[in-house]
Amino acid sequence: VDRLPLVDVDSSLSVADRAIVWDLRAPRVVLGLLVGALLAGSGAAYQGVFRNPLADPYLLGIAAGAGLGATIAIVARLQDAIGFIDPVPLAAFAGALLAVAAAGTLSVRRGRTGSPATLILAGVAVANFFTAIQTFIQQQNSETLQQVFAWILGRLSTAGWGEVRLLVPYAAICMAGLLLSVGSLDVLAVGDEEATTLGLRPRTIRRLVLMTAS
């Protein structure tokens, strides 16, 4: 507590105790809170778009797309080729956006966007396809299998303040975007025709929300 600004408390902690609390435990707690908030916001956005209380990132293949992107980056050893930035999160984000685009394209029929149920079915197909590609890549590159699984499953044991500082801008931008779209999602819950009558563009709103949630 005495490390916080404007707080004058004598904690009587040793240097080792301070290092354990501030350098090891605190960043894991903060990172866990940020990740949990982002997952909750993302899930709420998906449920608002699909009007389905069971919607999650797996329905559109977003998780599979992110896993495939990360797998390609790890297997291709892009971390060694690009030293100034970690390419794995960027590749995962690109894979997630690709999954959204693929599911959205498959759900379009005769130039019109399909129903949320059609989009979900397209997402399941995209998820299975991307998962099959990811599994094939893993089988062909067994030496990186452990690293790939460690990234996909996720862990906080190695988290530090560097990871927290890296995540904060993304969390702030994405959560702000999702909060700004709450009103539009409420209108979409009534129906696309009513939303169009009020001057909204349901298709554009869904795309923006899905991209932000991804």
Go through the PLM ranges and name each one.
Residues 1-214:
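Alpha-helical transmembrane segments in inner-membrane proteins
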